[in-house]
Amino acid sequence: MTSARWLVRRGIALVLALAGAATTGQTLPDKSKDKTLGVVNCASSLCHGSIGAWNGSPVLQNEYVVWSRLDKHARAYQLLRNEKSRRIAANLALPQPAHQSGICLDCHAHNPTTPAAAPHALADGISCEGCHGPAERWIAPHTAPGASHRGNIANGLYPTDQPLARARLCLSCHFGTSDKYVTHRIMAAGHPRLSFEMETFTNLQPAHFKVDADYLQRKGNFDGVKIWAIGQAVAVATQVDILLDPKRGRDGVFPELTLFDCHACHHPMADTRWKPHTAFGKSISPGLVRLNASGMLMLRLILRQTDAALGERFVQAVLQLNQAVAGSGDITERALAVKALADEAAKKIAGTGVSNDNLRGMALALVDDGLGGAYADYAGAEQAAMALGSVVNTLHKLGQLPSAANLNQGLANLRAGLVKDEAYAPADFQARLRAFRPLVAAPLAKP
């Protein structure tokens, strides 16, 4: 690639970064100019450090206790002191150990760019302010009489309740940004493969909030399918951001390989998985590394159910991007087209959501796409299984699917086919999907 092309891409990267910030109008917590004050300011028993939840309070007031005792984010820093982290740091020849290296601390702790003095401590891991934003401006007024959630956000509180903002925040570590990213080199040094789906991961964390009437009045309600769909759209846009970023999108003469399907390379030579067609049309040539299309597969399916015209434009844009990756076409132009459509989809879903009338069709499409061969790669199957969990759970809550026990057993059977990514067998996963389909297709018995 010529230096002139790199200069163009540097300008594009800046535009993309600014566009990402504009999506929510809020700076990510680690980039805020406000001062971080430390967890201790939240931990009083009269604030958020109560052993048990309070009755009659607008918040539970035991948030610190739940986080510190049960949430893995609180222990993220401690992982940097274990043997695996020491080995990764040594393999990367880092000048400092993992627990002192910014490349690790940026996602294993709240490591703000604005200097933070004690009592803030990196050892607190992903602390309160790591998600809710540095508290310099909002900590005093947020407890004052008449304080509002909107006012707190204006004072720097990060709006984690809003799916678009939450997706940007979570993906900044669980996928990456131009400033912090788990590269192929870091994975080769021993870091686990990253996987993320916003609705599933949100529910896996111990909730330090209760969605009651007061919560709904202050923050609104977002169903799981909407959160899942927005997360997928933002993930696709984030992937394209990294692909285009001159700092993160390449590593020497190679592209950044974590953006591509891991198992296109990491499988036995005798296991020939290349197919002439994919969900996005004619496949690129054998022997070429494929983009990780797992998020794109999910967004394609979502748009087919919510906006067919936008969905068709997205399919064509991804097909053209894949062709550009193979050397036919301008990759920058085509990647920007995919990002623009993903951003459009995220905003549309945030505004209108997903109709309950489309949910059963969406669940069936998740299954039928797999039966049609769309999940030839592990990452696609993994996302489909998590998506089915979100959609089926919502359908059951709506009374449109019976027997929670059977549904849970069916979902567990799907997950059992995904325990080891290296052992993933597409035909086996298809068989599991085939067994699951009747649970989704069966009409409710009439009373």
What does each of the following model-derived ranges do?
Residues 2-14:
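Bacterial N-terminal signal peptides that target proteins for export
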Residues 19-24:
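N-terminal signal peptide c-region/cleavage motif recognized by signal peptidases
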Residues 27-29, 51-90, 119-127, 134-382:
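Primarily the internal scaffold of c-type cytochrome electron-transfer domains
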Residues 27-45, 49:
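Short N-terminal segments immediately surrounding and downstream of signal-peptide cleavage
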Residues 39, 44, 109, 125, ...:
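Aromatic-flanked redox-active Cys/Sec active sites in thiol-based oxidoreductases
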Residues 40-48, 105, 129, 171, ...:
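Cys/His/Pro-rich metal-binding microdomains
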Residues 90-129:
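Post-signal peptide N-terminal segment of secreted/secretory-pathway proteins
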Residues 369-447:
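A cross-kingdom marker for long, charged
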